[in-house]
Curated annotation (Swiss-Prot):
Cofactor(s) the protein requires to work: Mg(2+); K(+)
Subunit structure: Homotetramer; dimer of dimers.
Compartment list: Cytoplasm
Record carries keyword Cell inner membrane: no
Function: Catalyzes the formation of S-adenosylmethionine (AdoMet) from methionine and ATP. The overall synthetic reaction is composed of two sequential steps, AdoMet formation and the subsequent tripolyphosphate hydrolysis which occurs prior to release of AdoMet from the enzyme.
Annotated source species: Paramagnetospirillum magneticum (strain ATCC 700264 / AMB-1) (Magnetospirillum magneticum)
Protein name per its UniProtKB record: S-adenosylmethionine synthase
Residue positions binding K(+): 45
Functional pathway: Amino-acid biosynthesis; S-adenosyl-L-methionine biosynthesis; S-adenosyl-L-methionine from L-methionine: step 1/1
Length: 388
């Protein structure tokens, strides 16, 4: 997004979107394993469709996290999201579990042995991004898309909007002038609802949530404010569309405002650099912007399976850097050990902190007291300032 004047659009989906239901179940399993053993290995994929949940993947961890417990975790996740519909109900959905032991070939590449440092769990590239468009240093379109759906979900869970059901999507288009967002030119919200309500009814339920989230004066013209454009959205969730873990990687990150390496997050323990290195890249980029060294920052990391150190570290501030970018890349690597183990140790990732990340974005969230969203901390700011 280097042009000065343009329109840019991002979307979000709610916790009840089929793909997010799958993400939530997969991350509930990750949390169960890490809660029982901080060094457990987990790679679990979930498929959800009409009254069916399928889990498959590879794990290495305590026997206490067995098929019965995983089934219970899946039902609890679906119940917490709010699905009690004929076509998808937490109580009576069929569950097929095909989770099995991790490959010994993968384990030997990842495990530390003797004087050999623990290697990355796979090859790959990961990106992190931050910009000063919002207080949480996230791009504005994805930030407001998330906030609209979070507000609606809170109203649904609290009982303030009982007409709403779990599945929903949002899309926000912002106008940028001189590189800064100035207003919303269009907003789209599609929200599942109980039968018997008109499109106009849902629009009036949704309207105050959009208006309260957007800055004053940013509400789009009425003919550019779309709510349930098809007119009806009663059948939804996994009963309407099949969901899979890892299919909302742009929603999970920066809404298309920054590159993506292609690896999904949910269902993976933090030895998987798809997840942990993407968190580290966000952490570094956010601290660069929070320190005032740049207005925006993209960081790319790359890894090879079984190799502990990153193969490359790339920093790009789109010409906004107030210091030398090459030196910045060196300093960042001095401040944080970017080996898989170094990242997990620095950010405290071997904890059951992942189910909460499964909806409304992995980034732009507030760090939790128990270590959740640790990659959103800005505790490198003073060290970065001193380095320059």
């Amino acid at each position: 997004m280097s042009k000065k004047n343009f329109l840019f659009t991002s979307e979000s989906v709610s916790e009840g979107h089929p793909d997010k239901v799958a993400d939530r179940i997969s991350d509930a399993v990750v949390d169960a394993f890490l809660g029982a053993d901080p060094y457990a290995r987990v790679a679990v994929e979930t498929l959800v469709t009409t009254n069916l949940i399928v889990m498959a993947g590879e794990v290495r961890g305590p026997a206490s996290v067995n098929a019965a417990l995983m089934d219970e975790l899946a039902r609890h996740a679906v119940k917490d999201i709010g699905y009690e519909q004929d076509g998808f109900h937490w109580k009576n959905a069929e569950i097929i579990n095909r989770v099995h032991s991790q490959s010994a070939d993968i384990a030997q590449g990842v495990d530390a042995a003797g004087d050999k440092d623990e290697g990355a769990g796979d090859q790959g590239i990961m990106f992190g991004y931050a910009c000063n468009e919002t207080p949480v240093l996230m791009p504005a379109p994805i930030y407001y898309s998330h906030e609209i759906l979070k507000s609606l979900a809170e109203a649904r869970h609290s009982g303030a909007a009982p007409q709403l059901l779990p599945d929903s999507k949002s899309q926000v288009t912002l106008e940028y002038r001189d590189g800064k967002p100035v207003r919303a030119t269009s907003v789209v919200v599609s929200h599942q609802h109980v039968d018997g309500l008109s499109q106009a009814d849902i629009k009036e339920i949704v309207r105050p949530h959009v208006k309260n989230v957007l800055p004053e004066g940013w509400m789009p013209a009425e003919d550019q404010f779309y709510v349930n454009p098809t007119g009806r959205f009663v059948i939804g969730g996994p009963d309407g569309d099949t969901g899979l873990t890892g299919r909302k990687i742009i929603v999970d990150t920066y809404g298309g405002a920054a590159p993506h390496g292609g690896g999904a997050f949910s269902g993976k323990d933090p030895t998987k650099v798809d997840r942990s290195a993407a968190y580290a890249a966000r952490y570094l980029a956010k601290n660069v912007v929070a320190s005032g060294l740049a207005d925006k920052c993209v960081i790319q990391l790359s890894y090879a399976i079984g190799v502990s150190k990153p193969l490359s570290v790339y920093v790009d501030t789109s010409g906004t850097c107030k210091v030398d970018e090459d030196k910045l890349a060196v300093v960042l690597q001095q401040l944080v050990d970017l080996s898989p183990r170094g990242i997990r140790t620095h950010l405290g990732l071997n904890k059951p902190i992942y189910a909460r990340t499964a909806a409304y974005g992995h980034f732009g969230r507030s760090p939790d007291a128990d270590g959740g969203f640790s990659w959103e901390k800005t505790d490198l700011v003073e060290q970065l300032k001193k380095a320059f």
